UniProtKB/Swiss-Prot annotation:
Protein name in the entry: DNA mismatch repair protein MutL
Gene name of the encoded protein: mutL
Gene Ontology biological process terms in this record: mismatch repair
Keywords: DNA damage, DNA repair
Function: This protein is involved in the repair of mismatches in DNA. It is required for dam-dependent methyl-directed DNA mismatch repair. May act as a 'molecular matchmaker', a protein that promotes the formation of a stable complex between two or more DNA-binding proteins in an ATP-dependent manner without itself being part of a final effector complex.
DNA damage recorded as keyword: yes
Superkingdom in the source lineage: Bacteria
GO cellular component: mismatch repair complex
Membrane-spanning intervals of the chain: none
Similarity-based family: Belongs to the DNA mismatch repair MutL/HexB family.
Gene3D superfamilies named in the record: 3.30.230.10, Histidine kinase-like ATPase, C-terminal domain, MutL, C-terminal domain, dimerisation subdomain, MutL, C-terminal domain, regulatory subdomain
Length: 666
């Protein structure tokens, strides 16, 4: 074994510089952070050859006391902390005291600084870590530092530097992050003698965003904020129309420090998930202000990462703030259309003294009387049953809006018959003949054996209690113009034109219904006339085995049929008549691409998304009643604005928008 050597100061400084100073932009970052800590309000950055030849920082901060000028370049010399405990309550950008020592050891560095209480300043020049001179000088209050010939004495590092253009771009990027993090500071970047970036320090974050990006982005932002006991989350997120195919327009600041965090990015993107199309990434500038003792910034040499004490709580806070803001913005955009005050949801007890005359109203019953499923019917007086169904006296009928995906685009409202009086006698007192008559009457309509029709012959009861969703003013000022290409529904309401993608809207309604059924463990399955046998590869079969409970809870009845063969006997009723094999393989492939740690909720959502996509039909010609039903079902959703894949379900044109298009107004 070789002898252990103690490295000299010059060597250790160069090694340390390799960690702290990766490229010229690292020098800019460290020096600008020092200026910010010094309370500067105007910071100028000058660079030449991408910072490889020259980096010059001028600030109007507090400056450095003459007695401290020399000490500032010693390793681990800092004014930010005094003990190890201070590391866990840091409120400054820098704290290690490594930057100046590292930079000066691999470059030629000149620094001039003056504090307000002195009439003159001090100037120091260091070359390769060695002090060449220290003298008095005349200068303004603040600090000016020049770093030239970076890595001149470390040829190995010079070989790995990128082009001047690439380094200039990296410096521009970090300056832009500073502009976003500190709207109250004016930054000026000069590249080769020409002004490249300029901010004005107005203190307005939107002004900073406009300076860094452009007018279009600054006009398509959604503000959000959330304040808890130890944390505040706030900032701006971009509307879906300014999303990008990469994450370059995403900025995270923790206590004003620009950081990169996968879990914070995941929280924002998950909040955005249902509002964006696949492979699109949202624009956002997010600020997290938290007590310093709840984070650790000393986990990376460049301080570009932080750790939180409670990442789960942080994730939820960020998710809720962003998701709520997006939902609120979309809701506000369609306020006139989705005005829930127009839909009067109430319990109406109607006292009817004469027969009700109804035009063949469909009541969808989600059970089959031939099965063992139970239907609970209670009444005070059970009278004779006519050839059709006789409404039982004092029976309560509670309507419940749902969607059933049968051969028609929509079926009528599902009704649930419930207790009108808990003390009433059970219908079991009826004899079996009565049950037989009920069953026959329910099956009279051959088109749908599960549909109960009420007409004027079966409403002789004196009183009916009905709980219903009934449009109040919703349709009064709404005009259904029609369909375009059997795909888009055109609606006029309150002098605004709404265009609804009927398939995206239908898919969203089905998705929410199916997801709700899965969550409530109430997925209705349909038995296939001919079971579908699928041969799987060993890998595919293993994925199925890992997720068979997911399939079961989603309404699939699957049995093993041989070594790597499965037999599908039942599928969710909501699917209608799907291509079972293709759907199953799509779901299996989707689960395969998921990480094993993904929660069952995410897997259920993936299944629901694929299932509903297969259930939506294309190019359907809808009647006015079907359009109204679709709108009613959209109205009760929490988020009717996007389909499960993130595409919008509708767009809106105001009269002003159209007049602008036709050049009637400017």
């Amino acid at each position: 074994m070789r002898k252990i050597n103690l490295l000299d100061l010059e060597t250790t400084n160069k090694i340390a510089a390799g960690e702290v100073i990766e490229r010229p932009f690292s020098v800019v970052k460290e020096l600008v952070e020092n200026s910010i800590d010094a309370g500067a309000k105007n910071i100028t950055i000058e660079i030449e050859d991408g910072g490889q030849k020259l980096i010059k920082i001028i600030d109007d901060g507090e400056g450095i006391y003459p007695i401290d000028i020399k000490n500032a370049f010693l390793p681990h010399a800092t004014s930010k902390i005094n003990s190890i405990e201070d590391i866990y309550k840091i409120s400054t950008m820098g704290f290690r005291g490594e930057a100046l020592a590292s930079i000066s050891s691999v470059s030629k560095t000149k620094l001039k600084s003056r504090v307000d209480s002195y009439n003159f300043g001090k100037e120091i020049y260091i070359e390769g870590g060695k002090i060449e001179y220290l003298k008095d000088t005349g200068c303004n209050v603040g600090t000016t530092i020049e770093v030239s010939d970076l890595f001149y004495n470390v040829p190995a590092r010079l070989k790995f530097l990128k082009s001047a253009r690439s380094d200039s771009s990296s410096i521009s990027d970090i300056v832009n992050r500073f502009i976003l993090a500190h709207p109250d500071i004016s930054f000026n970047l000069i590249n080769k003698g020409k002004q490249s970036i300029k901010s004005y320090g107005t203190g307005n974050l939107k002004d900073s965003i406009r300076c860094v990006y452009n007018k279009t982005i600054s006009e398509n932002l959604i503000n959000f904020e959330s304040h808890k006991d130890i944390i505040s989350v706030y900032g701006f997120i971009g509307k879906p129309e300014i999303s990008r195919k990469s994450r370059t327009n995403q900025s995270i600041f923790v206590n004003k420090r620009y950081v990169k965090s996968k879990f914070i990015t995941a929280a924002v993107e998950n909040a955005f998930k249902s509002f964006l199309t696949v492979n699109s990434y949202p624009f956002f500038v997010i600020f997290i202000d938290i007590f310093p003792e709840y984070i650790d910034v000393n986990v990376h040499p460049t301080k570009s990462e932080v750790k939180f004490k409670d990442e789960r709580a942080m994730f939820k806070t960020i998710f809720d703030a962003v998701h709520g803001a997006i939902k609120g913005e979309l809701k506000e955009s369609f306020t006139n259309f989705f005005n829930k005050e127009d839909i009067n949801i109430y319990d109406s007890e109607k006292s009817i003294t004469e027969p009700i005359k109804l035009e063949k109203e469909e009541v969808q019953i989600p059970i089959d009387l031939n099965s063992n499923n139970k239907i609970d019917i209670f009444g005070n007086n059970i009278n004779k049953l006519s050839n059709n169904t006789e409404l039982l006296k004092n029976i309560g009928i509670k309507e419940k809006n749902t969607l059933e995906n049968n051969n028609d685009f929509y079926t009528s409202k599902q009704n649930e018959i419930y207790y009108a009086n808990k003390n009433d006698e059970c219908l079991n007192s009826c004899n079996k003949d009565n049950y037989s008559k009920i069953e026959k009457s329910l099956q009279k309509d051959n088109k749908n054996p599960d549909t109960l029709y009420l007409n004027e012959h079966n409403t002789n009861s004196s009183s009916i209690n009905i709980k219903e969703n009934k449009p109040n003013n919703f349709y009064v000022d709404m005009k259904i113009i029609g369909q375009f290409n059997n795909t888009y529904i055109l609606i006029e309401k309150d002098k605004e034109l709404y265009i609804i993608d009927q398939h995206a809207a239908h898919e969203k309604v089905l998705f929410e219904k199916f997801k709700s059924e899965i969550e409530n463990r109430y997925v209705i399955s349909q038995i296939l006339l001919s079971p579908v046998v699928i041969e799987l590869s060993e890998d595919e079969f293993n994925i199925y085995e890992e997720n068979k409970d997911i399939f079961k809870n989603s309404g699939f009845s699957v049995e093993t049929f041989g070594e790597y063969t499965i037999n599908i006997k039942e599928v969710p009723l909501i699917l209608g008549k799907p291509n079972v094999e293709n759907l199953f393989m799509d779901i299996l492939y989707n689960l395969k691409n998921m990480k094993s740690k993904e929660t069952s909720t995410i897997k259920y959502n993936a299944i629901a998304t694929l299932a509903c996509k297969s259930a939506v039909k294309a190019n359907d010609n809808l009647k006015e009643e079907e359009i109204k039903k679709l709108i009613e079902d959209m109205l009760i959703l929490n988020n009717p604005y996007t389909c499960p894949h993130g595409r919008p379900t509708m767009i809106k044109f105001t009269l002003k928008d159209l007049e602008k298009k036709f050049k009637r107004i400017q």
